Design a protein with these regions (language model features):
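Short, hydrophobic beta-strand segments
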Residues: 25-27, 88-96, 126-130
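Flexible, glycine/charged-enriched surface loops at secondary-structure junctions
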Residues: 59-69, 82, 116-127, 155-163
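An extended, acidic, His-containing surface patch that forms the Zn2+-binding/catalytic region
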Residues: 127-168
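Generic non-transmembrane alpha-helical segments
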Residues: 46-61, 108-120, 144-152
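A conserved active-site cap/scaffold subdomain adjacent to cofactor or substrate pockets
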Residues: 81-106
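Histidine/acidic-residue-rich, glycine-tolerant segments that coordinate divalent metal ions
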Residues: 1-85, 167-168
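Hydrophobic alpha-helical scaffolding
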Residues: 37-40, 44, 95, 99, ...
Length: 168
């Protein structure tokens, strides 16, 4: 595991790995020539507003003690430097340790996507895929694993496993 030394083990009770979830949002506008933007409905500014608004979800829509990550990792739009594209695709990942926080993030992302598009007279397709739930170790089994590890490598080589936003 990253950060661990050879011969060390780690285990802890509670959340240890985040849920893994993917999203794809396709913003639909109306393409046109860049010299005549008034004849188009440019989806690029819509996408930019949306990405910025997503950054407020964790800081303003979840409790400060609840961990979560919203990462927009791919933005695809257009093929030419003088043409306003018809659409923009945003893709990324969402990570959390609880289903409740995940529900809230998905709800807010959908609202932000739909309302941002409406404000610009664009439309969107919103896809959210829940791939894996969070890994949450029970106290009893985590303690059993720690005792077994300690019997093999010694108690000083068994560390507390910090939660990670990495996933299964």
């Amino acid at each position: 595991w990253p950060g661990g030394e050879v011969g060390q083990f780690a285990a802890s009770a509670g959340p240890v790995m985040a849920s893994s979830n993917d999203f794809c949002i396709t913003i639909k506008g109306k393409g046109g020539h860049a010299a005549m933007p008034h004849n188009a409905l440019d989806p690029v500014p819509v996408a930019c507003q949306m990405v910025l608004a997503f950054q407020t979800i964790i800081s303003r829509n979840t409790r400060p003690i609840d961990a979560g990550v919203v990462s927009v990792t791919m933005v695809h739009a257009g093929e030419a430097n003088n043409v306003i594209p018809d659409s923009v695709a945003l893709r990324g990942t969402v990570r959390t340790f609880t289903v409740e926080v995940l529900d809230r993030i998905e709800q807010r992302m959908r609202q932000i996507a739909e309302h941002t598009c409406a404000a610009f007279e664009a439309t969107c397709e919103f896809e959210f895929v829940r791939n894996y739930p969070p890994t949450i170790n029970s106290a009893k089994e985590a303690e059993l694993a720690r005792r077994l590890m300690a019997s093999i490598v010694g108690e000083d080589q068994v560390l507390v496993q910090e939660p990670t936003m990495g996933a299964e």
